């Protein structure tokens, strides 16, 4: 599933082209994705201007004129791409994914050039909703989200606050979207390895009123920031179906220290990385370095 860095990479790839563009036409190649498309979806979009493109956690927010926002989630395999006529013709002949193009918007940019904004989703777990922009952040999908890991308020102190009395694992708490918005399995595994913290460790141990606990919480917060920043710079991680807006691949997976490296040597101590299941998800870690 695309996580925060992948979604932010999509946002950064689309934003310069689509901001200020007018939606000229909308083609839906099916009636639904995970959920049915909003009623009269195409008709409601045609003629609108895309005022900007935001992100909250793993959601893309296409802000439109007339106070509506397309709330888009990529699901397990969704992607957006932007093409002119030349690139679209080329992709239609070389890409095995074109048959999974479910939404195509023709948009006219501020300079008059026409682009094709396409949503592709092999597994169809993504979805799009139309939401009133004026009450956007009161929407049930957004209202209870926690802090963004790149926000100024995200810190070791914040983690200590939310870890108080949490007997569940560090990994379990960090994957809770009401506590940290946008983090997923890959980057939690990577940040915990950098922090030398076991994914099985009780979260409450970092909330203790000791200097050691404060230092561990501060280190974890910083390593989460670092992993996210580096992944965005690399264009995200290409696992299974994820591609960037220009059709190219993300490269952060080449920098994984633990994720997907079961049986390979720990880059710090040399013993084999192990994989365990936590709540049905794979956790990769070094049993010697991470305590």
Swiss-Prot record:
GO biological process: base-excision repair
Enzyme Commission code(s) on record: 3.2.2.23, 4.2.99.18
Source organism of the structure: Bartonella henselae (strain ATCC 49882 / DSM 28221 / CCUG 30454 / Houston 1) (Rochalimaea henselae)
Necessary cofactors: Zn(2+)
Function: Involved in base excision repair of DNA damaged by oxidation or by mutagenic agents. Acts as a DNA glycosylase that recognizes and removes damaged bases. Has a preference for oxidized purines, such as 7,8-dihydro-8-oxoguanine (8-oxoG). Has AP (apurinic/apyrimidinic) lyase activity and introduces nicks in the DNA strand. Cleaves the DNA backbone by beta-delta elimination to generate a single-strand break at the site of the removed base with both 3'- and 5'-phosphates.
CDD domains in the record: EcFpg-like_N (cd08966)
Top-level taxonomy: Bacteria, Pseudomonadati, Pseudomonadota, Alphaproteobacteria, Hyphomicrobiales
GO MF entries: 8-oxo-7,8-dihydroguanine DNA N-glycosylase activity; class I DNA-(apurinic or apyrimidinic site) endonuclease activity; damaged DNA binding; zinc ion binding
Annotated coiled-coil segments of the chain: none
Matches recorded under HAMAP family: Fapy_DNA_glycosyl
Keyword Translocase in record: no
Subunit text: Monomer.
ZnF FPG-type: positions: 257-291
Binding site for DNA: 100, 123, 166
Reaction catalysis annotation: Hydrolysis of DNA containing ring-opened 7-methylguanine residues, releasing 2,6-diamino-4-hydroxy-5-(N-methyl)formamidopyrimidine; 2'-deoxyribonucleotide-(2'-deoxyribose 5'-phosphate)-2'-deoxyribonucleotide-DNA = a 3'-end 2'-deoxyribonucleotide-(2,3-dehydro-2,3-deoxyribose 5'-phosphate)-DNA + a 5'-end 5'-phospho-2'-deoxyribonucleoside-DNA + H(+)
Highest taxon listed in the record's lineage: Bacteria
Keywords assigned: DNA damage, DNA repair, DNA-binding, Glycosidase, Hydrolase, Lyase, Metal-binding, Multifunctional enzyme, Zinc, Zinc-finger
Catalytic machinery residues: 2-3, 58, 281
Entry's cofactor comment: Binds 1 zinc ion per subunit.
Entry's family note: Belongs to the FPG family.
Gene: mutM
A matching Pfam family: H2TH
Listed name of the protein: Formamidopyrimidine-DNA glycosylase
């Amino acid at each position: 599933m695309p996580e925060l860095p992948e979604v932010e990479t999509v946002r950064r790839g689309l934003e310069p082209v689509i901001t200020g563009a007018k939606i000229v036409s909308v083609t839906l190649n099916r009636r639904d994705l995970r959920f049915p498309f909003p009623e009269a979806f195409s008709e409601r979009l045609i003629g609108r201007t895309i005022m900007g493109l935001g992100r909250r956690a793993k959601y893309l927010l296409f802000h439109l004129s007339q106070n509506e926002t397309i709330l888009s989630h990529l699901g397990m395999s969704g992607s957006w791409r932007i093409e002119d006529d030349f690139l679209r013709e080329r992709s239609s002949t070389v890409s095995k994914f074109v048959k999974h193009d479910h939404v195509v918007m023709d948009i006219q940019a501020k300079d008059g050039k026409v682009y094709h904004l396409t949503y592709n989703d092999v597994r169809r777990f993504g979805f799009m909703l139309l939401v009133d922009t004026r009450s956007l952040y009161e929407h049930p999908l957004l209202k209870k989200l926690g802090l963004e890991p790149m926000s100024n308020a995200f810190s070791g102190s914040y983690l200590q606050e939310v870890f108080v009395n949490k007997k569940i694992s560090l990994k379990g708490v960090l994957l809770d979207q009401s506590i940290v918005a946008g983090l997923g399995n890959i980057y939690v595994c990577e940040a915990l390895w950098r922090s030398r913290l076991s994914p099985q460790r009780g979260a409450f141990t970092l909330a203790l009123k000791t200097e050691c606990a404060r230092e561990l919480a501060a280190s974890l917060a910083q390593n989460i920031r670092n992993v996210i920043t580096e992944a965005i710079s690399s264009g995200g991680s290409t696992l299974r179906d994820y591609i960037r807006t220009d059709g190219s691949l993300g490269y952060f997976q080449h920098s994984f220290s633990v994720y997907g490296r079961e049986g390979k040597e720990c880059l710090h101590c040399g013993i084999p990385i192990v994989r365990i299941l936590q709540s049905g998800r794979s956790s990769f870690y070094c049993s010697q370095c991470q305590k």
